[in-house]
Amino acid sequence: MASIRELHQQLVKKERSAVEITQEALERIEALEPKLHSFLCVTAERALEQAGAVDAKIAAGEEIGLLAGIPVGIKDNLCTKGIPTTCASRILENFVPPYESTATQKLADAGAVMVGKTNLDEFAMGSSTENSAYQVTANPWNLSRVPGGSSGGSAAAVSSQECVVALGSDTGGSIRQPASFCGVVGMKPTYGLVSRYGLVAYASSLDQIGPFANTVEDAAILLNAIAGHDPKDSTSLKVAIPNYAASFKPDFKPRGQLRIGIVKETFGEGLDSVVEQAVTKAVDVLQSLGAEIHIISCPRFRYGLPTYYIIAPSEASANLARYDGVKYGYRAPDADNLLSMYTRTRATGFGTEVKRRIMIGTYALSAGYYDAYYLKAQKVRTLIKEDFEKAFRVVDVLVCPTSPTTAFKAGEKTTDPLSMYLTDLMTIPVNLAGLPSLSLPCGFDDQGLPIGLQLIGNVLREDQLFQVAYAYEQATTWHLRKPQIS
């Protein structure tokens, strides 16, 4: 499937209609879903209606935006009015939101075509999309491998070209890690850049919505559409949003002397040698484009994982207290009193990993342990943020691997939670600091599985991240390789 800009030109020149483009996406979804399981819900009827509205505008001589008529996948933890939003959980099995999330509303206003809701780890808690209550998504590059998580459905859908772009959410790496595993571009914006209104909460101080795309430019276009202040979200930032793709040119090179820092702590034990080699070669490419390379130390980077697994479950234990079978979603049958209904609903409605994190969070917040765990974790979070602040006084952009490994086999880590958690080792500190970060393809291992390069920027420097990523993308061909799904 072509890029956003290419499809836009085809629509404007009336070489193709939005309905034709949408029909092509729906046919591809129908053909691939028995193997991939990227989508929990395909919204064919709504998609064709939205596409028809775009065609009517074109026929009337009206101007259309870049996203008009473009097939988009939506992670199923973003509320969509009249369309089921399950968070891949039994407890929200029949939940149909009465309102639209700000991010999806902005896409609808831009004329984008929603082709369906994508699979995820239940309540976005996981790193492989194996925690979904409904189905396990496969990696398009190797169907026996996981696509990453928690936004594995969105990553797989974009990688396999079931849709042009997709939305995901990132709490500790849930956009960037699956982007790395599936060989696509994934961006976690600065905390507060994109409204969280209508995003089902996991850990409110960490959650952020962002784009998946096959190219850096497409990711930039999608982020432009969803970014901006929203009075419905008290954490939404009041800042001007630049046109991220405005300075992209075929021979683009970063302006001025770009200083890039290699995060020293991300190399060493636990990092696959093939990943290390690919990232090192990517740094060489950036240096050849004129970047000045520095070795940077972020000494508390390694404390990100334990810090996250106190803070995120603590917030989750509070956020998920609302699911009790009273107002919406699943309600356990045969309960003989209110307390029994609560306990049975939560015991049978939540999956194993969600219950594990609720218990961890409840323990960390309990009397006698709050200071030792939650309060201490918040102090370490501040120290991690300070390390990044010091680094950005020396360099403009930080680089490191997105994940220590390439995609692992389905079932390989399901009985070992700690091993699963370690796949987000390099993405989590960025969420704790609220920084923007982007993953893009930088190579493949000897089994043909993609490797991701992570670029980390200072607060609200998405523009700089996109420019560096675009320069690297134009100097390489990794993004041109596509999975052959047999």
Swiss-Prot record:
Q: Does the keyword Ligase apply?
A: yes
List cellular component terms (GO). glutamyl-tRNA(Gln) amidotransferase complex
InterPro entries, per database record: Amidase, Amidase_CS, Amidase_dom, AS_sf, GatA
Q: List the disulfide bonds.
A: none
SUPFAM superfamilies reported in the protein's UniProt record = Amidase signature (AS) enzymes
Q: Name one GO biological process term.
A: translation
As recorded in UniProt, its EC number(s) are: 6.3.5.7
Q: Which Pfam families match?
A: Amidase
Q: Which GO terms describe its molecular function?
A: ATP binding; glutaminyl-tRNA synthase (glutamine-hydrolyzing) activity
User: Which superkingdom?
Assistant: Bacteria
Is the keyword Ligase assigned to this protein?
A: yes
- Family the UniProt entry places it in: Belongs to the amidase family. GatA subfamily.
What function is annotated for this protein? Allows the formation of correctly charged Gln-tRNA(Gln) through the transamidation of misacylated Glu-tRNA(Gln) in organisms which lack glutaminyl-tRNA synthetase. The reaction takes place in the presence of glutamine and ATP through an activated gamma-phospho-Glu-tRNA(Gln).
Could you identify this protein by its name?
Glutamyl-tRNA(Gln) amidotransferase subunit A
- Give the organism's phylogenetic lineage: Bacteria, Bacillati, Cyanobacteriota, Cyanophyceae, Nostocales
